[in-house]
Amino acid sequence: MARAGEGADLLKCSFCGKSQKQVKKLIAGPGVYICDECIDLCNEIIEEELAEATEIGLVDLPRPKEIFAHLEQYIIGQDSAKKSLSVAVYNHYKRIQARESGTGLGEDGVEIAKSNVLLIGPTGTGKTYLAQTLAKMLNVPFAIADATALTEAGYVGEDVENILLKLIQAADFDTKKAETGIIYIDEVDKIARKAENPSITRDVSGEGVQQALLKIIEGTQASVPPQGGRKHPHQEFIQIDTTNVLFIVAGAFAGLDDIIATRSRRRGVGFNAPLHDADEEDLFSQVRPEDLQKYGLIPEFIGRLPVVATVTKLDQEALVRILTEPKNALVRQYQRMFEIDGVELEFTDDAIESVADQALLRGTGARGLRAILEEVLMPVMFDVPGRDDVERVVITREVVLENVNPTLVPREAPSRRTPREKSA
């Protein structure tokens, strides 16, 4: 037993040797003692080792087919985009691990460049959700930014460095962790320059923002103000290297299909060669850098986004599947909420189809499904939790379209107990 020489009753830490008078707390074990300072040190060591263990390792990095299979569980359709993103994400993190292990440069000195992603498709088709699901699967920090809020330095609006601050915040200000995160920039089509030909007038929310984004997307050592907002002298900055940050930039690119169609016609056989009747999504899949440049993206910006993936509009069948099939399908979420109150929630097939039809009618796609369900279920979600006589709520087509009251199936005995009460 560790004891100090001053007196038989004075104990000391078996690890650092400090006496009980030199520390705040001394905890006894079978023949040993440990002080609060050594406990804190042990906790720091464990946290560091756990942080290293949670980093993506080359052995543990899921292969493209595994990433695709995971996306399949949560995202309906969009197979082409899921495949493109699965490959892009795998190659990106494989490149990071190769650099960290010293194998990034082969014997011939070839260095693998970063491949950021451009995601094209209509609103409400799952672009943001694709990126979120990938980041969650890989356990990396994830930040979403809106390109329309950005302006070039010196003008009212957000600096591009504020995007990096969001990523740092998502990583709990652990910059090392943030440096391998994913940033999703939405509405990037809105920062296309206003005219195809460069103008002498300032385009502070268009070409100027594209120029400002170039460096951080390509990879640079950026200085980020910890409080956000504009930079000013004499303030402290957080330094972050964006070399290994994966950027996924996305937009609806309304009108891009017309540019692609015109280019395809021009290269067809004959003066007025008719273009085959092609859907918008088919045209998007044929996009080329020259089309994006004509749309208003500058060549340098296009060059930083070598991987182009496209998502398609969702039809009624796809929206019905989104409502019912994924692991966290919206219908299942609401059924679970009612189940907590001891009530069964049932949707008829035509009710679900009607919800999908409403989303198509509003032009909101998958993004609007939750809002429609909230509108339909709000009255019953308000009323049923206060009643003990309801066993099941049935939502029909008429409830969705005609705003009639849902069918409330009474229970045999008015003694409902929630799952929490049953386990008590």
Swiss-Prot record:
InterPro entries xref list: AAA+_ATPase (IPR003593), ATP-dep_Clp_protease_ClpX (IPR050052), ATPase_AAA_core (IPR003959), Clp_ATPase_C (IPR019489), Clp_protease_ATP-bd_su_ClpX (IPR004487), ClpX_bact (IPR046425), P-loop_NTPase (IPR027417), Znf_CppX_C4 (IPR010603)
The entry's keywords: ATP-binding, Chaperone, Metal-binding, Nucleotide-binding, Zinc
SUPFAM superfamilies from the UniProt entry: Glucocorticoid receptor-like (DNA-binding domain), P-loop containing nucleoside triphosphate hydrolases
Amino-acid positions noted as binding Zn(2+) in the UniProt annotation, renumbered to this chain: 13, 16, 35, 38
Ranges of residues in domain ClpX-type ZB: 1-54
Pfam families linked to this entry: AAA_2 (PF07724), ClpB_D2-small (PF10431), zf-C4_ClpX (PF06689)
Gene3D superfamilies attached to this UniProt entry: 1.10.8.60, ClpX chaperone, C4-type zinc finger domain (6.20.220.10), P-loop containing nucleotide triphosphate hydrolases (3.40.50.300)
Alphabetical GO biological process terms: cell division; proteolysis involved in protein catabolic process
Binding site for ATP: 122-129
CDD domains: RecA-like_ClpX
Residue runs in coiled coils: none
Cellular component GO terms, alphabetical: HslUV protease complex
GO molecular function terms attached to this record: ATP binding; ATP hydrolysis activity; ATP-dependent protein folding chaperone; protein dimerization activity; unfolded protein binding; zinc ion binding
Recorded family membership: Belongs to the ClpX chaperone family.
Record text on subunit structure and interactions: Component of the ClpX-ClpP complex. Forms a hexameric ring that, in the presence of ATP, binds to fourteen ClpP subunits assembled into a disk-like structure with a central cavity, resembling the structure of eukaryotic proteasomes.
Task performed by this protein: ATP-dependent specificity component of the Clp protease. It directs the protease to specific substrates. Can perform chaperone functions in the absence of ClpP.
Protein's UniProt name: ATP-dependent Clp protease ATP-binding subunit ClpX
Record lineage: Bacteria, Bacillati, Actinomycetota, Actinomycetes, Micrococcales
The gene coding this protein: clpX
